Regions:
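Flexible, compositionally biased loop and terminal segments
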Residues: 1-211
Length: 211
């Protein structure tokens, strides 16, 4: 999330105006830090703090779902030192924010492919998901090693396997079938998309859901 975000007191929003699902592309952290002659990792650290504040505010407002684009499947081209810090920051964030999630009745969900993530990060993810599974408030969905095209490909593979095993009939496939096999199955489509760096592109994020 762009570290330039300043959290000001939010005016009360009429219940009928509150979005059900907010999706945020968290970019601009490294550039924010570089403009201030700071290392890129400083920007990522401040971005994590902004994510915490926004998550708490969404929980306060009663927003059902908040999806944060934390790490794109295309981010692996970054320097190894930066990637190592991002993995460390992610694991640290998930542990430190457990109390916050429990206090605010937040349930954690994580989407994306796990194949390139360190085992330590996966373990922390699973522990945090299990710990918050009984919470009934805002669903905080973190997109980690996520790509919208990969999500659709994975959904098609699941559907193809079900057709092959005759669990699913080709003629019965419709849009809802695809939605049910996406990483976000069970979630509503976003009705508000925010890109913190202000760029006007979606960067392979929730392609099916926001179309």
């Amino acid at each position: 999330m762009s570290s330039s975000i300043k959290m000001e007191p939010v005016l009360e929003i009429p219940p009928d105006k509150i979005p059900r699902h907010v999706a945020i592309i968290m970019d601009g952290n490294g550039r924010w830090a570089q403009r201030r002659d700071q290392p890129r990792n400083h920007g990522h650290q401040n971005g994590a703090e902004s994510a915490r504040k926004i998550t708490e505010e969404c929980a306060r407002l009663g927003i059902d779902q908040l999806t944060l684009f934390c790490l794109s499947s295309e981010n692996w081209k970054r320097p190894q030192e930066e990637l190592d810090f991002l993995m460390f920051l992610l694991a640290t964030y998930l542990v430190q924010e457990r109390d916050t999630m429990m206090k605010n009745n937040i349930r954690l969900k994580i989407i994306g492919r796990r194949d390139r993530l360190p085992q330590k990060v996966i373990s922390v993810m699973d522990q945090s998901i299990a710990m918050t599974s009984g919470n009934t408030g805002t669903c905080l969905c973190l997109a980690i090693n996520y790509g919208g095209r990969a999500e659709i490909v994975d959904a098609m593979r699941q559907i193809a396997k079900k057709i092959e095993s005759r669990e699913l009939d080709v003629e019965s496939i419709d849009e809802s079938t695809v939605s049910q096999h996406l990483y976000t199955s069970g979630m509503s489509d976003p009705d508000l998309l925010i890109r913190t760096a202000g760029e006007m592109r979606i960067s392979n994020y929730l392609l099916w859901q926001i179309s």
